[in-house]
Structures are given as C-alpha cells and as structure tokens.
Amino acid sequence: MIFHDITTIIRFAIRKNNADKIIFFIENLSHFRFIESIFDYFFKNNYDITVISLENPFGTRDYNNNNLSLVLLKDEKDKITTLKNLKGKLFITTTPSIGTPIFPKSQIIPKEDRPKYLYFFHSLVSPNEMYVKNSFKNFDYIFSPSDIITEQLNFLVSNKTEIFTTGYLLFNNIEVGNYSKDFDDKVLIAPTWGEKGVSQLMN
C-alpha cells in the first residue's frame, strides 16, 4: 500500500529528527485531498499539528483536537513572515519552491529549531516541464509518485535531498466504475488546472 510505505518513511523521519511538532502547509481545500490520508494518520495518533493555509483547507470535514492549531494567513506579507519564523520538526506540503523569496524557509535561531521540509506531488506531470527553476532543490525529503519522476528529480535537487519513490497517494482511492453508455457524438476536454486552462485549448 502506498499509504503504508509513506507513513513508514515519515515515522523514520520523525524518529531521526526527534519530531514533536508537525507543520502542514496546505494552500487551500483543493490541495488538502492530496495529503488527506497523511494528515488523518497524524491527527488520529494525536501528534502536535499546526496547519498553515490561505483558507480553511478542511471544507466540511470536522477536525477538533487540542493538538491541532490552524493558522489562516491574511495576505502575502503574513505568509512570508509566518514561514520565516516557524519552529517545528517536520514541514509537509504539496507546494513546490520552498526556500525562495515567495515561499521562504524558517530563519529562526538556533537552526536546530527549524523544520525539515517534505514535499508531496499534487500532480503527475514532469518536474522538468511544469515547474520553475529550483522548485525542488531546497526540500529535505521528496516523495516521488513514479520511477520516471524520480529519475528526473535526481538532476533537480541538492545532494542533501532524499527522494523516496512511493507512488501517488490518490491511487489509493481508485474505484472500479461501471460505465456502459457510449457517447459517439461528444468530445471529452480535460484541461489542466488554472483559470485559463479551457481558453488556451479553445484558442
């Protein structure tokens, strides 16, 4: 199971770094589903969790625990200030480009109080094609969804980054569907995410 493999590696990272506080950076509700199973695991096991987000990432889900704190960022300035002053052991996110001016790492002293940074892919696109330069260079741990992406990542990270090929978490949710109706007179358009996804295809 993909989930089992990932939690095993994260538990190792927790022991290695003596982690007593886990931080999740989740941009919004649409990003939460990519690491929901990971979050649920730590939530149910009563880890000390801080979630940093641009909006409530849980939607209608009910998470109520004294060990969970939610930090909703007011604006870009608040985001940068918060990230620069983080204290914790592990920082888990699906957002690339950590360590850049728009997504900075913690700068607190002593350095031992700064978290290790873990990245989960929220898509299966090539890291060579869809990401800006240095999107992966500053992560400590990266969980790759495939062997091909792992091969590409090896040229995009620092020599300190550890890459684990674990698979794509959403594949744990695949269900067999029974679709028997054919639509010979229709075309399926599947644009990528973003406001201009459809308009770019139409033009």
Where are these regions (language model features)?
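N-terminal pre-catalytic "stem/leader" segment of glycosyltransferase-like enzymes
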Residues: 1-88
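Active-site-proximal region of nucleotide-activated glycan assembly enzymes
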Residues: 66-77, 90-100, 110-173
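Structural motif
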Residues: 25-29, 52-56, 94-97, 121-123, ...
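Short, charged/polar "capping" segments at the starts of alpha-helices
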Residues: 31-34, 56-63, 100-103, 150-153, ...
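A short, charged/proline- and glycine-enriched loop
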Residues: 14-22, 113-115, 181-186
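Glycosyltransferases and closely related glycan-assembly transferases
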Residues: 43-44, 83-87, 101-116
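A structural signal for isolated positions on well-ordered beta-strands in alpha/beta enzyme cores
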Residues: 23, 48-51, 118, 141, ...
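Conserved catalytic-core segment of nucleotide-activated headgroup transferases in glycan assembly
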Residues: 31-46, 169-203
